[in-house]
Amino acid sequence: MKYKIEKNTVQETLILPLYSRKLCTELYPNLYRDETAVRLLDQIDYDFSGAEKSSRSLMQRFGALEVAMRQNDLVFEVQAYLKTHPCAAVVNLGCGLDNTGRACDNGSCKIYNLDFPDVSTVRNELLPAGEREKNIPCDQSDAASFAKIDASGGAVFFASGVFYYFLTEQVKALVQTMADAFPGCMLVFDAAIRTAVKMIAK
């Protein structure tokens, strides 16, 4: 039985990045592969007609390529951190149905996937936590969620396509909270110019 996702819900925000990763896997397999995205989309009951129609456009194809390069960059940075902190916490902020934590897994790190409760509900159903992995439902601006993270071996946080939806002051506050809670931790994220952010956040 497929998991149904309704239009105009928080859960619907999972669809576009997941579809973009699937599209890039199909279009540019030599650059990027996300078999999890391909598998998960087959398990979701949703009207994909709009996404499928736009996938033929040059803009959407470029967007899919951008998503792939972003994910590759994030994995590179996280894996580089794990070389010197092999038992670190790998924290995916605004995880959605993204499997990057597992893509970075070195066999000894701990993986934490943080997102809103509605999103975590879908993730627990379609992408349940594996060994050394936890899905944590939370508001990312709430520092209380950080208490559930074991950073005794270090911590590397990454946010993929997340901060576009935050105000500048919210990002500053979150980064300060993380710095206070996890001294010496690393944060990896993507950014864009103001015009691009407005287009992305529509």
Label the predicted regions:
Residues M1-V91, C95-C138, A151:
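Rossmann-like AdoMet
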Residues L114, A159-S160, F189:
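Active-site flanking residues adjacent to catalytic metal/cofactor-binding acidic residues
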Residues N135, A144-F146, Y165-P183:
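A short, conserved alpha-helix within the catalytic core of class I
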Residues Q140-A143, F163-Y165, I193-V197:
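Short, catalytically relevant binding-site loops at active-site mouths
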Residues F146-F157:
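A short acidic, Gly/Pro-enriched loop at the edge of an enzyme's catalytic core
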Residues A155-S160, V171:
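A short beta-strand submotif of the Rossmann-like class I SAM-dependent methyltransferase core
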Residues V156, V175-A196:
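Conserved beta-strand signature within the Rossmann-like core of class I S-adenosyl-L-methionine
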Residues M199-K202:
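Short, glycine-/aromatic-enriched active-site segment of Class I SAM-dependent methyltransferases
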